């Protein structure tokens, strides 16, 4: 009887662990989708920033600082 009770307990725990594992997997998949979407948005923003800097003549690193008064 004790062995049967222990087996039932283990089966119950495994079922809960399977459910938890599935839920965690779904969260990881959704997070990966969010990361990929954010990476695309960041790349688009970088491109827009580079385009705007090109239009306004962006700051050149070799440009001398203005004289102080």
UniProtKB/Swiss-Prot annotation:
It comes from the Bacteria. InterPro entries: SlyX. Belongs to the SlyX family. NCBIfam families: PRK00295.1 (NF001421). This is Protein SlyX homolog. It comes from Pseudomonas paraeruginosa (strain DSM 24068 / PA7) (Pseudomonas aeruginosa (strain PA7)).
């Amino acid at each position: 009887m004790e062995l049967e009770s222990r087996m039932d307990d283990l089966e119950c725990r495994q079922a809960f662990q399977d459910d938890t594992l599935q839920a965690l997997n779904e969260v990881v998949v959704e997070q990966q989708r969010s990361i990929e979407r954010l990476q695309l948005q960041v790349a688009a923003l970088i491109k827009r920033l580079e385009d705007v800097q090109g239009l306004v003549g962006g700051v050149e690193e070799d440009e001398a600082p203005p004289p102080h008064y």
